Amino acid sequence: MKAEDYIAAMMDCPVGANARIVARCVALLGALGLVGWALQSAASPHPAETTMPFGRNPVQTSSQLPVGLILPARLNDTLKVKDLQKGTILEFRVMQDIPLPDRDKIPMKSLVRGSVVNAIKDSDGPGVNIALAFTQIVNKDQNFSTATSLRAIASYMAVRDAQTPLNGIDAGSPAGWANTVQIGGDIRYGDGGPVRNRHRQRVGKGVLGGVLVHVSANPSLGCDGPIKGEDYLQALWVFSSDACGVYGMKEVKLSHSGNSEPVGEFTLHFEKDDMKLDAGTAFLFEVVNLPQAQKR
C-alpha cells in the first residue's frame, strides 16, 4: 500500500470519533496494509526463494559413500510388475540410522531413489526380467550420489516374522526387548543385547530399531564379506550378518546382483508378469565402485 493511499484512508476516519470507531479504523488500515504487501510481493520479479518441506535445501555432497556400505531400506509403495517400464521411478526409506566412518550418519527415513533400467519379457514364457539401479540417497541435509548392488531382498511377511518375538513378552514391556530371529537366521537378543549367528558366534549387537553387526560372506549364495578387509559394524535392520539372496518370495529370483557388469544394476526375475512388489518389501543394498567405463 502506497503512502498516499494511507493518507487518503486516514482522511476518511472521522475526527473526534470515539474509541470504538478509532479502533475499527486502525484495524481496517492494518488489513489494507497486508493486502497491499501481498499484492506487491506477488508482482515482484524476485519472489522469496522457496525451500524443501524439510526446512532447507539438501546439500549435494561431493564425498563418496564408502564401497561396501550396507543400506537397509523398505519399498514405499506397492508396484505391479506389468507397470514397471524403463524410467519408472522407485523410492525406498532407510529403516535404521547408518553410521559412516567419519562419525557422521545417514539418518533413518532418508530417501533412496532409483529407476527401472529396462524390463524384458521372457521369450518362452510369462516371466519378465526387471533391471533396476539405485543412485541417490536424500535427506534433509544431504544428497548423496552413489551406485549400489542388491545383497538381499525379503517379503513384507518375512520382515514381520523377523520382528515377531521368539517367546511372548510381558505386557507393557517394550517390543525391542524381545528375542527375535533375523532374516537369514541370526538371533537378536533384544535392544543392547548380542546378535549371534547360526554357529552361536557373536557378530554384533541389537540397537533401537535394528542391529549393528559385522557383515559376513555367504559363498554358497554368492555374497562377499567385508570389502578390502574393512570390517566395521554396519546397520542391517532385520537382516542377518550373512543375509544373501531372496527370502519369502517364491516366484522371484535375483538373477544379477549388480556386483559384476553391468555394475550398479541388479536384475529381478519374476515368473509371471502379473505379480507385484508389495509395499514394505525389504531391500539390502550395498555401495559398489562404478567402473570408469560406466560413469557418465
Question: Where do the language-model regions lie?
Answer:
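Generic N-terminal simple sequence motifs
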Residues: 10, 41-43, 68
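Signal peptide processing junction and immediate N-terminal pro/mature segment
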Residues: 36-49
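Compositionally biased regions
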Residues: 14, 26, 42-45
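Short amphipathic alpha-helical "recognition" segments used for binding
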Residues: 6-8, 28, 44, 53
